[in-house]
Amino acid sequence: MIEKLIVLEDIDPVIFYGVNNANMQLIKALYPKLRIVARGNVIKVLGDEEEMCAFEENITKLEKYCAEYNSLKEEVIIDIIKGNAPQAEKSGNVIVFSVTGKPIIPRSENQLKLVEAFAKNDMVFAIGPAGSGKTYTAIALAVRALKNKEIKKIILSRPAVEAGEKLGFLPGDMKDKIDPYLQPLYDALQDMIPAAKLKEYMELNIIQIAPLAFMRGRTLNDAVVILDEAQNTTTQQIKMFLTRMGTNTKMIVTGDMTQIDLPSSQTSGLVQALRILKGVKGISFIELNKKDIVRHKLVTQIVEAYEKFEKEAKAERERKKLTTCLL
């Protein structure tokens, strides 16, 4: 008789054990010769060495399945322990699975292009309107790379200038000041990583979320780095960000040209970067549009209404300019 401790890593034990420990009870029933005690993320096993080896091998398979799909069903447990390959999930173009087990997939042609560009290039620019899924897809790609151990960390950043607010005038300490700007990034991560695991990742700096200014002076290795709302970077800021790229690192830059909040006297760093970097090998540019919007159907209509208004306003300015020149 031997005793062994098996530590579950990179998964939520609550999902692995099942509701009311149903999964663990099933595993115990399938291994009647072993004494199995599970607490937290540790499984303690006592029994025959040969039986123990088979148990450990199958727990590893179940753990891998749980990490990939964020779920563990009873039929999967039975299939794996009985030596059958579990029936394949309908993965198709699945990037990752949400914490509820729902597949996160590209929901439009241009989102799929973003996924394909990320696979082939080390730097991708994704430009599109609000709700087109560019940031959510980018974060899903980063989470997949982390789960597959292709990288060691995820770094998410945004320039904190939306709505023209100055951080110094906002209440609270630095974390209180910057968190509202970064909340959309937290929201996406919470969809894809169990709360306890996400907290652990952030405490260990495996996942880092910070304003763009905090990137200065760093070299970012073994990471997927995402710069969101890049239209609000200055030319100096985006150059600083892009040159942080280290070994085994991929970058995704997202932005919406219709939501530039910089003072009118400043040029958007994203606009300039698209012009300067066009044609550089290893950099891909993906444009999303209103057809890619996956939010409420009203969002598409709102985007169209603003596009029409801005087009008419531009035409009116040109007309007035021409009239002035003729006088």
Per-region residue spans from a language model:
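Conserved helicase motor core of SF1/SF2 NTP-dependent helicases
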Residues: 42, 97-109, 116-227, 231-327
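N-terminal presequence-like segments and adjacent domain-start helices
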Residues: 1-14
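A short linear hydrophobic-aromatic micro-motif
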Residues: 33-36, 285-286
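Interdomain "pre-motor" coupling segment immediately N-terminal to P-loop NTPase/helicase cores
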Residues: 29, 36-91
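Short, surface-exposed acidic/glycine-rich loop or hinge patches that mediate macromolecular interfaces
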Residues: 11, 21, 49-50, 232, ...
